[in-house]
Amino acid sequence: MVELNLNHIYKKYPNSSHYSVEDFDLDIKNKEFIVFVGPSGCGKSTTLRMVAGLEDITKGELKIDGEVVNDKAPKDRDIAMVFQNYALYPHMSVYDNMAFGLKLRHYSKEAIDKRVKEAAQILGLTEFLERKPADLSGGQRQRVAMGRAIVRDAKVFLMDEPLSNLDAKLRVSMRAEIAKIHRRIGATTIYVTHDQTEAMTLADRIVIMSSTKNEDGSGTIGRVEQVGTPQELYNRPANKFVAGFIGSPAMNFFDVTIKDGHLVSKDGLTIAVTEGQLKMLESKGFKNKNLIFGIRPEDISSSLLVQETYPDATVDAEVVVSELLGSETMLYLKLGQTEFAARVDARDFHEPGEKVSLTFNVAKGHFFDAETEAAIR
């Protein structure tokens, strides 16, 4: 059983006036697949490196299986890492690359052979064991890098953007490979990415991080915005940042006020809210106050039947760009000065400049405080 506890971890670099990572607090369960996701500079890789022992922890405690390991060397933490750049030895065969770490730890020849061949079978590399890295595709090289970690049989696997060097098609297949490998070996895993699709498809839980400029503007501070399952983050974002980061295309946002049971914006949006939403917002003190209304592209419909059923939730907007994606069409539209997106039926393709009527499924909308950007519930 392997659990990790990151107890209020802080990181400040020498000669810096601010923390690069601030109050990172997380408990990771045995065999859990955790993904750190966020924009560049949010501290996700720095946090991973602190777990690995490659960066010192300025403040806070890191525990592995209940033992504080802040001062333990990386080699003594029983952690295996997979990096973005593969880090393979070009003059060695696949077999020798995978066996190298075990040889350094003085494993017997028989034990090395058994572990390498087992890992190769899991990763589909058996027929490539005698080849050199130059003779492999990008995806095969990444599997070798993963194999080198798997043979270690480490307590914890750390993966730092392992798919970012691969093309889009290969990333999709490798995501499936990583998920399959995790199910098979069941190791506690921390995975870092800037790609929210990777996070949503791989994670048991996601840690969303943000970066904000420090007061003197000399750097950024990385903070945790929300931790939860992919479904929790998608359906119940804690704030506007999380709502806008998770989902592709991103959630649409409108600056609105509530007037006579309707959401009203300066750009011409006027749609009725549900009775339950109205009561909730008024009970929270948002009657006649500015707030932010968020709605996902898939919750906006161009169906005539829906428009006839919900006329008080329908608006007219101008098409800016229309993308036919085969099974669906993405409409990028403008309402006054506000741009937004709608995911509609493939047949609803429109030329730029056309006016279209769209119905908002307000019941699936989200509300955020205009000042704090925190979710209103």
UniProtKB/Swiss-Prot annotation:
Q: Which SMART domains match?
A: AAA
The family database entries (InterPro entries) matched by this protein are listed as:
AAA+_ATPase (IPR003593), ABC_transporter-like_ATP-bd (IPR003439), ABC_transporter-like_CS (IPR017871), ABC_transpr_MalK-like (IPR015855), ABC_transpr_MalK/UgpC-like (IPR047641), Mo/tungstate-bd_C_term_dom (IPR008995), NA-bd_OB-fold (IPR012340), OB_MalK-like (IPR040582)
Q: What is its main location?
A: membrane
The subcellular location is:
Cell membrane
GO cellular component, alphabetical, reads: ATP-binding cassette (ABC) transporter complex, substrate-binding subunit-containing
Single GO term (MF): ATP binding
Q: Which residues form the ABC transporter domain?
A: 4-246
Q: Which GO BP terms apply? A: carbohydrate transport
Tell me the keywords, alphabetical order.
ATP-binding, Cell membrane, Membrane, Nucleotide-binding, Sugar transport, Transport
Instruction: Kindly indicate whether the keyword Ribosomal protein belongs to this entry.
Output: no
What kind of membrane protein is this, topologically?
Peripheral membrane protein
* Residues binding ATP, per UniProt: 38-45
Presence of the UniProt keyword Ribosomal protein in the record = no
The UniProt similarity line reads: Belongs to the ABC transporter superfamily.
Q: What does this protein do?
A: Involved in a binding protein-dependent transport system responsible for the uptake of melibiose, raffinose and isomaltotriose. Probably responsible for energy coupling to the transport system.
Q: How is this protein named in the record?
A: Multiple sugar-binding transport ATP-binding protein MsmK
Q: Which organism encodes this protein?
A: Streptococcus mutans serotype c (strain ATCC 700610 / UA159)
Q: Mind giving the lineage of the organism this protein is from?
A: Bacteria, Bacillati, Bacillota, Bacilli, Lactobacillales
Q: Which gene encodes it?
A: msmK
